[in-house]
Amino acid sequence: MAYPFQLGLQDATSPIMEELMNFHDHTLMIVFLISSLVLYIISLMLTTKLTHTSTMDAQEVETIWTILPAVILILIALPSLRILYMMDEINNPVLTVKTMGHQWYWSYEYTDYEDLCFDSYMIPTSDLKPGELRLLEVDNRVVLPMELPIRMLISSEDVLHSWAVPSLGLKTDAIPGRLNQATVTSNRPGLFYGQCSEICGSNHSFMPIVLEMVPLKHFENWSASMI
């Protein structure tokens, strides 16, 4: 989860988030190099009145600064496309969970079980226990097995919502009348927090998401107790 005054991204919990963080560093390095070069050239232009006459009308220089940006854009686009295709892949999910957005709560249905469904509301600040997080805790957490591919089917009953868990690299729009899907895979157990990321009304800020990733054995025990 995020902390106050945090400068970097949240710790990656899924393979997709690890790829996104690597892509972020890759792109940031390119931006830093370009910015440094531009600032260096500007500083030279401001500190000297001399001009190279050979660069006033140089075909070679114009060719270089036309081709070089194209190469840089390709170096950014190819890793980006690779990650986009990875995010769309869903390989043999062991579990499917249907997520519906409402004003202003989430409902979940484990489609592999007959009667395993519940609503998830934010816990009011006045009802929080010591150590719980304000505006992020819910009365019913989404319990999922770790280290296994899980398919999330996401839609909405009323207006546009967005189901987002940053540490897992997830952000999928919940659109009325349309069913979007995403893959959830966690490398480690724990609680992972998210929120609705699409302005959906007056209580938009009060639609938290809490995923509880547990070992498969614990998930089986939990699902048996819920049915």
Swiss-Prot record:
GO biological process: ATP synthesis coupled electron transport
Domain of life the protein comes from: Eukaryota
Subcellular localization, as worded in the UniProt entry: Mitochondrion inner membrane
Reactions catalysed: 4 Fe(II)-[cytochrome c] + O2 + 8 H(+)(in) = 4 Fe(III)-[cytochrome c] + 2 H2O + 4 H(+)(out)
Manner of cofactor binding, per the entry note: Binds a dinuclear copper A center per subunit.
Binding-site residues for Mg(2+), renumbered to this chain: E198
Entry's transmembrane regions: 15-45, 60-87
GO molecular function: copper ion binding; cytochrome-c oxidase activity
Chief place of localization: mitochondrion
EC number in record: 7.1.1.9
Keywords: Copper, Electron transport, Magnesium, Membrane, Metal-binding, Mitochondrion, Mitochondrion inner membrane, Respiratory chain, Translocase, Transmembrane, Transmembrane helix, Transport
Residue ranges, Mitochondrial intermembrane side: 1-14, 88-227
Topology in the lipid bilayer: Multi-pass membrane protein
Known cofactor(s): Cu cation
Positions on the Mitochondrial matrix side per record topology: 46-59
Role: Component of the cytochrome c oxidase, the last enzyme in the mitochondrial electron transport chain which drives oxidative phosphorylation. The respiratory chain contains 3 multisubunit complexes succinate dehydrogenase (complex II, CII), ubiquinol-cytochrome c oxidoreductase (cytochrome b-c1 complex, complex III, CIII) and cytochrome c oxidase (complex IV, CIV), that cooperate to transfer electrons derived from NADH and succinate to molecular oxygen, creating an electrochemical gradient over the inner membrane that drives transmembrane transport and the ATP synthase.
Similarity section: Belongs to the cytochrome c oxidase subunit 2 family.
Subunit architecture: Component of the cytochrome c oxidase (complex IV, CIV), a multisubunit enzyme composed of 14 subunits. The complex is composed of a catalytic core of 3 subunits MT-CO1, MT-CO2 and MT-CO3, encoded in the mitochondrial DNA, and 11 supernumerary subunits COX4I, COX5A, COX5B, COX6A, COX6B, COX6C, COX7A, COX7B, COX7C, COX8 and NDUFA4, which are encoded in the nuclear genome.
Protein name per the record: Cytochrome c oxidase subunit 2
This protein's encoding gene: MT-CO2
